[in-house]
């Protein structure tokens, strides 16, 4: 009703951008006639106009027209009008919802260029290193062509490289790298070690994945703490001996376990202790973690065991996350369960959530194919509006209604049969599964039916081939099984991705000749042997024996055709030229990848080697496209890509992402979900009602049912889960907001010290406040002066400032409390000047160095302890909800007290340390006769 009266709010939003779109299109003819040099000169002209008082909004139409023209020349891609709209939405600091295949990556070039003109830096953020690298290489060409510098942050980079890349106009990187660099910068001990500039503007690709899916996971930098390994092993034995229902209950929804009274008795009996909560010998924490590890953390679902280590699997992307560990002893409990080496527990040194990290930017924007379902959360927490950008071509995807089976076994058989039917007609199929284990169940069923397929999951032997598999997933009769759709970012193009194949072919010849062998190459990961031609995507044990040598050989079936003799001889010639210029096996892998990336770009280059490689790349591309375009038409005729979902995800948004793989850019396609009553979503959130229906209808195991009631039950279950998780994220945000204010205060203080701002004045201020604290501790203004404890006051002052050893109680006996404070402040200033001249006799700037050292040392040490205290406080206030108190209000007020105590301790410790500081002269090295 309201929509009819007021009109669609989304359309109203888009309407206000329309005049700018018209203006950009009118400017197109003007910029088309400019030479490359003149187009590049526009960048300096825009910067000059900004200096002279014009705003970014004033420049928007012209800058967008210039970027569009540069993109046409360099990439051969012209921004559609809807992409211009997307760019304006991003420039306004909003979220642009754009469907898969609508060119989100190209859209980001528009606001990135415009905002980079200020010189304050722009961050383009993606979810993994591979995508960051791809975008920096691919879209970076446009920016480089226009004279802007482009940086890239990768996990393996040194601090010097990071600093150089952050100093660029536009920097591509992942959310986690940006976050960890922010934390590391705030732990550095000199300003030279700081790599980031102040956070200005950022565009996040897959913004829902970063700001919502990852919002519950804080980024943590930690140090190691010794803990007894035996406790984890004993607790694991206890967990195995205890029985569910009888000794403990599992709350899957809250991912928690609760011991029953019998459970407590049994656990205490096995361990031979009288109380699990005994503060002298606490066991409860270990036992709870061991039961969680047994019941809630499943091998091949939540983690995999690789090289005798527990490696976490990201529940949203299905990717492994090496190096990440669960905190609070949980990781150790899982190590004990799997009988691998138990590593030391860690102590948090610095932490931040993505929610608060991205709110540090002056302006934030993002793009995704699916944001509308989470619009309320984006607006409430991040103050980000969501605007839907219309598609360039109408959507032809057909979403077939879900089918539900009674048992999981029947569901998997039905999925395998559906794959067989589609394979028969030659349609490509993408099957989304929710765990490594389930993808392998389906793989076995397909092998029994002799259906060749590719497996894409967190297993190491499949990860290496991720983008290669996705790039081919749209070819005729291809069957791809993907866990949680890892590989987001590589488009599934019907008929196959010719550009990617041409790059693979050139790499296959070039890389073995110019890349250093593995043991000389510190940056490369452990490599995986690729399967031989004709295999089903299983690479044996995924390891090569002997010395780790990377294999660049690609399975021949990846390519649509063998390259012509001419192309092959040109390719060998180009590779020889590269070897001649760079040397045989002499480049680190990252550098070689850069060379390969530039060779497959269109940006102008004077390098003869790159020109040769580019010439042969384009020739191979042409040969491949002749095949892929025919195959594209064939696949379109047969109905396009068919996407099969095998379980509804907790969130409708993730389901929509999987569906969005089919029917990109107006192509045909279809999607269907196959479900069972044993699926987690139905089991945990509302399966009883559905099971009741099934039993009432006496449905056979293998008989599918499709019904409106079922579909609405599922939708309701998903809404319940979404609300549940939103509440958790909101709570995380509200609690972290308290920490965030403290973090900002402490990091701002730290940065001022690092930059060496007024160090002496700061320490004198600390010393004066410490004198005030001492007076307030020993002088009670409500008592008569003769009862004031002046002897102790003087002793305490001397304890802090030994240079005031001549101070007597009689010197202050006749003073009022404010006069006493003034007197001691003056004394401490004189003492500090005396201390400074003593220290500086040894080296003129030594006192400033000492000030910086002691302040940073105390801030870091006490902040670490403070983080632990705040964690303990958060757990403690959680219990107060039972006593009718609001835990959040309690946490805020007590957290503030704890913070003030820490700030006081920092001041006092710094003053004490500096007055105690007595530098020693280094003895001169004696001359050897």
Swiss-Prot record:
Pfam families membership: P-loop_SecA, SecA_DEAD, SecA_PP_bind, SecA_SW
Catalytic activity: ATP + H2O + cellular proteinSide 1 = ADP + phosphate + cellular proteinSide 2
Keyword DNA damage: no
GO biological process, one term: protein transport by the Sec complex
Location, primary (coarse class): membrane
Subcellular location: Cell inner membrane; Cellular thylakoid membrane; Cytoplasm
Family, per entry: Belongs to the SecA family.
Class of the enzyme per the UniProt entry, highest EC level: translocase
Record's keyword terms, sorted: ATP-binding, Cell inner membrane, Cell membrane, Cytoplasm, Membrane, Nucleotide-binding, Protein transport, Thylakoid, Translocase, Translocation, Transport
Positions of disulphide bridges: none
This enzyme's EC code(s): 7.4.2.8
Name assigned to this protein: Protein translocase subunit SecA
GO cellular component: cell envelope Sec protein transport complex; cytosol; plasma membrane-derived thylakoid membrane
Coiled-coil spans in chain: none
Binding site residues for ATP: 83, 101-105, 491
Assembly: Monomer and homodimer. Part of the essential Sec protein translocation apparatus which comprises SecA, SecYEG and auxiliary proteins SecDF. Other proteins may also be involved.
SUPFAM superfamilies: Helical scaffold and wing domains of SecA, P-loop containing nucleoside triphosphate hydrolases, Pre-protein crosslinking domain of SecA
